[in-house]
From Swiss-Prot:
Annotated EC: 5.2.1.8
Protein name: Trigger factor
Protein keywords: Cell cycle, Cell division, Chaperone, Cytoplasm, Isomerase, Rotamase
Xref: InterPro entries: PPIase_dom_sf, PPIase_FKBP_dom, Trig_fac, Trigger_fac_C, Trigger_fac_C_sf, Trigger_fac_ribosome-bd_bac, Trigger_fac_ribosome-bd_sf, Trigger_fact/SurA_dom_sf
One Pfam family this sequence matches: FKBP_C
Amino acid sequence: MSSNIPQNAVEADTLSNIYTYKELSVDKLKYEYEITVSSDYIEQKINSRLQEIAKNAKFPGFRSGKMPYDLVITNYKNEALEYVINDTIDYCSSDLMKKIEVKSHIHPKVDIMSLPNLDKKDKKGDFLYKLSFESMPKVPVIDLDKINLKKVKAKIKEGDIKEFIDSIKTKFPNFVSVDDASYQAKNEDKLIIDFEGRIRNKLFQGGSGKNFTVNLGSGTFINGFEDQLIGMKKGETKSFKLRFPEDYQVISLAGQEAAFSVRVNDIQIAKDLQSDNEIARRIGFEDHSSLIDHVKEVIDNQCKEMEDLLIKKELFDCLDASYSFDLPIEVVKQEQQRVERELNAKDDSCKEAERRVKLAMLFMEFSKEHEISLTQSDIMNVIVNQYVSKDVSFDRVFKHFKSDGQFQELVRGQALEYKVTDYMIEKASKEEQIVSVKELKELFDNI
């Protein structure tokens, strides 16, 4: 049986005038055009598409490629129309941007206004759609010769080291048992207790313990429990009742009244260590000298981190103030949503988003001008330092990176920012300013 494929179909690409366009609006980076494609072109493209489909079309009772053409039309007309419309939009939109000399664009939006009615013999109507998009702005190249930065450097003194060690000592208190039998327990004392808790005279799960350590004022037990222990003496026993909170995490205990019995086995109070070496050994170091060396290193690393962030902040402020150009609205909107998620607030989110987009575009242009490219190591550093944690493994993050294009774009953007800013700071003119550790912390806190 004949396939009845028409032999006089004209290839649409041979037409000289495929579409016409009309400018609807141009506002800074935003463009809007109305594009009209003749119904003849659409019809010819559909016929060509149907011929391609017919070569391999399958239908019960016919061999592959031998399906009657009228059945091909009936079964595949809508599929062919969708294919042709999408292909036409891609071709015409791309060609239009070349004609109006838009080299790069973002977020094109297509609104189909009308489709031709190919079932009519006359007045089929043309294919009409609206194309909206934003062009990429012309981004200026950063002139490093015009950038002068203040490099803050902290000078570590003995007082800083002593203050740091004193703060560590509070985290490693030295407790000693009280010998005075008349001593009454106070807040911040450590008690060694036996206790039992019962509800309706039945011991509940987790309601008892032997030689259990309680730091008074720590809030380890339910509200009111530790208050009952204040004033008790070593060897004393006390009974009291407390009610569990209504929102207590163990549902079976929530809101229940419990009777507690407590015996104080020992009371320990904080006592200062006498020598520097005792302090060092208490914290886990061989001697005081080793502790000082460690503290110096810790403070130095903390200062370097603050110094780096301060000079980067100054560089960003300088670039933000020195360069101005139109920003793509849709890109800013997307960044604004990210800012609001990060800061959990909408105040100033638009301003911060505009700043981030501007800096990202400046960095991108600078990297092209200075041929700064990313390596695998740059990407890995961002993944490890920014996203891997004790709760999120490297394998999990890297798998997400490989499968999610948006996350890839985010990570690459961060990696490029770090590499470009390091390059700029290294090359830019810098004036060193010596400050104390306290002054450095104040500057950092005011970022």
